[in-house]
C-alpha cells in the first residue's frame, strides 16, 4: 500500500537526514498543516465558506457569461455518459457461502463490536443475535462498549455476560471523548479479530451473516464490506417507506459504482473491516461526525477495495417523524460533505485511479454541490426572468435517481410468479413515493452547507425510541 504524509517514515531516514530533519522536519510541518487545515471545526468552517462563495460565484458568472448555458449542457452530457456506464454495468456476484466444519475449513477470527448508550430497549436482542450466529463460537467474539449509559443497559449486560462466554463488556466513564469513534478505538487494541464488524444496537442480524461476509476477505486487497441496510419498520408511515426506498437506491448505486471501478462506501451499521486495513489507516477518526464515511475515504486513499453484500440485509429502525428525519439527515449531510473538505488535497494527488476520482467528482457534484447551487441559480433565474440555468443537470440528477430507485427496488422485490409487467405498477408507485420523499435533500443540503460556512456546529442527535424496552427488560430479569 502507498505511503501517505500522515504515516510514520522515520525509520527510513539516514543519520544525516535525521539530523537535518531536526531543523526542518517536513513531517512536523505536515502534522501542523493537518491539524490547522484538514482537521478541526475552525478549519472546516473556513473551507466550507470558501466553497460556498465559490459555488455562488460560479453560478452567477454562468448566468452572465454568453457561453454559460453551453457549458452546463456540456457538463450534463459528460455526466450522462458516466450515468450510462453505471446503468449498463452488471453487478458483481457474491462469493459462495462459507461451509464446512471448523476442523477442516480455516475460519478467520471475527470481532463484532457495538457501541451502546442508553439502549436498554434493544441491547438484549442484539447481544443474543451476535452471540448466536452460525459461526464457530471460538472463532468470533462480541464486544459491547457501554458509553456511560444511565438507564438499565449496564445491568442487562451484566446478566448477558453470564450467559455468553464470548461476550466482553467495556464501560466508559463520563469524561470519555470521541463519541462512537472513541468508543470503538478504545477497545480495538484489546480485540483479536482478523475481521472487525460494527453494528448499531438496534440492528437485526441474520444468523448466517458471517458465513456470507468472510469469503469476501479472501482477497489480500479487500479492505471492507458494507452489508445492505433495510428498514425494519418500513410499513409504519410515509417517512419509513421513503427510507426503505432510499436504502434500495443506495444499494443499487453501490453495486453499480463498485463494478465500474468507483467508490464503495461504508454505512456504519453492518460494516466489516479487515484488521490490516483498519490498522493501516489509523482506526476510526474521532474528529468526525460520520465515522463510516470518513473511514471510506481513507481506505480508498490507501487503495483498499470496499464492497457490498446485498443479501441478506441488516435491518435497523427508521425514524418515524419529519423532525427526527431532519436531524438525522443533517448529520449525514454534514459528515458526507465534510470528508471532501478534509481530504480534497489527497483525493486530488494520491494514486486512486481515474475511475475512482471520476466517480467521486460525479457524486460530489450531483449529490452535494448541485442542491447548493440551485439556490443562487433560482434567484438569478427570477431576477433575469428565465429558466434556471442548471435545469439540465437537475433533470439528469432526478432522472438517474428515479432509474436507480426503480431498479434497486426491482432487484430486492421477489417476483412470486409475477412477470416484470405485472410488477411494474407497484414498483412505479414505490418509486414515485420514494422520489417525492427524496426531495427533502434539496432543502437539507443547502441548509447544511450554509450553516457549516457561517455558524458553529449545532447538530442535535434525536434518539430513536424503541417500543420493546419493557418487554426486553422483563425477559432478561426473569432469565
Curated annotation (Swiss-Prot):
Transmembrane domains' residue ranges: 48-68, 363-383, 389-409, 428-448
Cofactor(s) listed in the protein's UniProt record: Mg(2+)
Effect on the protein upon substituting residue 331 to A: Significantly reduces the monoglucosyldiacylglycerol synthase activity and blocks temperature-dependent activation
Name of the protein described by the UniProt record: Beta-monoglucosyldiacylglycerol synthase
Localization: Membrane
Species per Swiss-Prot/TrEMBL record: Synechocystis sp. (strain ATCC 27184 / PCC 6803 / Kazusa)
Lineage, highest ranks first: Bacteria, Bacillati, Cyanobacteriota, Cyanophyceae, Synechococcales
Record keyword Oxidoreductase present: no
Catalytic activity: a 1,2-diacyl-sn-glycerol + UDP-alpha-D-glucose = a 1,2-diacyl-3-O-(beta-D-glucopyranosyl)-sn-glycerol + UDP + H(+)
GO biological process, one term: glycerol metabolic process
EC number(s) per entry: 2.4.1.336
